[in-house]
Amino acid sequence: MKITPTLEECKIIAAEGSYGVIPISTELYADMTTPIEVLRILKKVSGHVYLLESAEADKRWGRYSFLGYDPLLEITCYNGMTTIKSELTSRTDSGDVRGIIRNVMEENKSPKLPGLPSFTGGLVGYFSYDYIKYSEPTLRLDAKDEEGFQDVNLMLFHKVIAFDNYRQKLILILNIKTDDLEINYHRAERELNNMKELLLNGEKAEHIPCKLRTDFQPLFNEAAYCNMVEKAKHYIREGDIFQVVLSNRLEAEMEGSLLDAYRVLRTTNPSPYMFYFSGSDGEIVGASPETLVKLEDGVLHTFPLAGTRPRGATEEADKALEAELLADEKERSEHNMLVDLGRNDIGKISRIGTVEVEKYMSIELYSHVMHIGSTVRGVIREDADALDAVDAILPAGTLSGAPKLRACEIINELEDNKRGIYGGAIGYISFTGNLDTCIAIRLAFSKNGKVFVRSGAGIVADSVPEKEYRECIQKAAAVRQALQKAQEGMEA
């Protein structure tokens, strides 16, 4: 079994930089397996697993799928209390969760090695919509919490399985501590061999179907949602805000697993961010079209999506709807506000003069809807890091409104129900300092026998309440249909 880098190369890397860990790796052929099969093997041996995948706008599969299991640590935070849990210990701290996350990342700082994918280990999980109360402590968010998810749930994975979809290879990655390097390297050789044996010969977890025991019930019926829109428009007329995003939640009783729903989503709604999580906070599946923020080698990107139409039944119908969407002054105005907000958010942590709009108002097509999309870029300041990027941008303007803080206050008042994972950030912070997170939309999450789906619509001065209610329904369609189809039965 060939392992790179060698022990001698690791010694040189450790001597050249102040690294806490170094990733070593080996490869297997993957032409007779799939990411879903690997996931089921991992679910057999660990209750904490993830799968991150990607598909481009033209439905080509992204190069890498990332899988992980058996985390070293789990960091959770709820209402200011942070718990750090390992296999043997658990402690709760009232200190700043961001400081705790930074300490963990500093202890595990890693070099970026040539030939390895963008993610080789780090923290994987979510920051909820309500995480803004930690980055903006003067903001009061006191809505009811009926779902019971954490404000932050991040798991530290030192083992990563990267599925190279182009080369049809599995890259098995293990991060080793740089203290006692020789001992740790030889221990890691044995662990990589164990990972190899698990993937080649491991049993798959039992297939557990998904079953909805009740129909979905909305948090707000059409009349209640339209009334909420009218109240929001009053705030707009009074000058409090220019725009606000109001969401609606669907809830049903469920038994079984969401894995089959994810299998449906990844084939019927391929998206830039597709994810499956299973952990102490339940299951999360989704196919999000929208980046919250990406940081790679010092360059920041965010991709505002705002302005929506349903997909047409034919290519000609699509083209007509695209033209209609781009000509709609209400949609263009909403999009421009959110591009400006994205520039402002990126600008908080970027070097002066580096913020620019790279792509402006292009049409992005997805399975059930189309959006207007733009790309905002900046170069991060030397004194800022990945967590600063999350602080600056979460929640995205496309899920809150403008001005952002006042919009969040109005959402708290009108919805009066904690959003939890919806509208937050899902993804990873790498040991190398890189970050890739999507906005937590087009997702379902389950806990304690219930499954939740949320969607929202952007409200501006001339919004038609009934139309905004229908937009919410359209945005939830792909996830609802995936859950319905998963019930029809899938081969194990």
Provide a role label for each language-model segment.
Residues 1-492:
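Extended alpha-helical targeting/anchoring segments
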